Curated annotation (Swiss-Prot):
Keywords: S-adenosyl-L-methionine. This is Probable S-adenosyl-L-methionine-binding protein MJ1583. The keyword Ribosomal protein does not apply. S-adenosyl-L-methionine binds at H45, K46, R75, Y106, N107, E108, T109. PROSITE patterns: TSAA_1, TSAA_2. Residues 4-126 form the TsaA-like domain. It comes from the Archaea. Belongs to the tRNA methyltransferase O family. InterPro entries: TrmO-like_N, UPF0066_cons_site, YaeB-like, YaeB-like_sf, YaeB_N_sf.
Length: 126
């Protein structure tokens, strides 16, 4: 059995998103700064049900005019493990809050990890 421990939650505001990091993990933010790009992994908790985890084919972007594809070939939130990934720029860090551009995660979406973006590691040469 695997166990994921959320490190914070998403807070949605009108024009931006805040990543609220739980106090016990704030020390892990040391070294991040304004202007850095980070990868944020979240748990799509509103799509987490046994039925939704069994969905393996979807119409991309929810458009029935798009042919069905396997979920691993899409960005669908319906997945066996409903993990979402965002690459975002840090606009400000204040205490336990990271201010970023607006993302489409729901308010209170659990944050399961943050990683610094590395062009060398995250942008394959094609």
């Amino acid at each position: 059995m695997y166990y994921l421990k959320p490190i914070g939650v998403v807070e949605q505001n009108e024009n931006y998103t805040v990543l609220n990091i739980f106090d016990e993990f704030v020390e892990g933010l040391d070294g991040l700064k304004e202007g850095d790009y980070i990868i944020v992994l979240v748990w799509f908790h509103k799509n987490d049900s046994e039925e939704k985890r069994k969905i393996l084919k979807v119409h991309p972007r929810g458009d029935i005019n798009n042919p069905l594809k396997g979920v691993f070939a899409t960005r669908s939130p319906y997945r066996p493990n409903p993990i979402g990934k965002y690459t975002v720029k840090i606009h400000k860090i204040y205490r336990n809050k990271i201010f970023i551009d607006k993302i489409d995660a729901y308010n209170e979406t659990p944050i399961i990890d943050i990683k610094i973006f590395s062009e060398k590691l995250d942008c394959p040469k094609i």
